[in-house]
Amino acid sequence: MSTEEKKIILGKVGAVYGIKGWLKIHSFTDETEAILDYFPWSLKLGNNTQTVEITDWRKHNKVLIVKVAGIDDRDEAQALVGSEILTNEAALPELSEDDFYWRDLIGMSVVTNKGYDLGVVTDMMETGANDVLVVKANLKDGFSKKERLIPYLFEQVIESVSIENKQICVDWDPGF
């Protein structure tokens, strides 16, 4: 087994803010500021990855901005723009039995409770009311669907999720 810990993407470095090396952050966490709960951060741009220390942060007009140790001017900060923000997978909290991280659902096959293969989860969307599975249909889909949007409503639509089998069973009409 590798001694490298598995990394997950928490967000992305947006633009430079000001002239003193501050950076705008695009957080992929539910609450924007929750990205600050996970450390250490590694910034990955292309094939280069570096661990960084956040020395300060602020919220500015609903945008999170951070100060990285050793980055003290606009030019140094510009070199980090576009970097993915990574942390160790082990930093994520354990979830209850019926909760899953989106990253665990993406790539799973989706089948109906009658055995019809609807396709593979390619993305997730947050709608406010509930999350939605974006399912890319199989090439030979009998209903000529290319993509399906299936609400992630546990026990109403989602009957079961098997991490081991990488499969989600749904109560869903394949023609819809």
Swiss-Prot record:
Full protein name: Ribosome maturation factor RimM
Gene Ontology biological process terms from the UniProt entry: ribosomal small subunit biogenesis; rRNA processing
Q: Does the keyword Chaperone apply?
A: yes
User: Where is the protein localized?
Assistant: Cytoplasm
What InterPro entries is this protein classified in? PRC-brl_dom, PRC_barrel-like_sf, RimM, RimM_N, RimM_N_sf, Transl_B-barrel_sf
Top-rank taxon of the source lineage equals Bacteria
Q: What does this protein do?
A: An accessory protein needed during the final step in the assembly of 30S ribosomal subunit, possibly for assembly of the head region. Essential for efficient processing of 16S rRNA. May be needed both before and after RbfA during the maturation of 16S rRNA. It has affinity for free ribosomal 30S subunits but not for 70S ribosomes.
| Organism the protein comes from | Colwellia psychrerythraea (strain 34H / ATCC BAA-681)
Which NCBIfam families does the record associate with it? 16S_RimM (TIGR02273)
Alphabetically sorted, this entry's keywords are: Chaperone, Cytoplasm, Ribosome biogenesis, rRNA processing
Annotated PRC barrel domain residues: 97-176
Give the domain section of the comments.
The PRC barrel domain binds ribosomal protein uS19.
Pfam families tied to this protein: PRC, RimM
Quote the cellular component terms of the Gene Ontology held in the record: cytoplasm; ribosome
**GO MF annotation: an example:** ribosome binding
* Protein family: Belongs to the RimM family.
Predominant cellular place of this UniProt entry's protein: cytoplasm
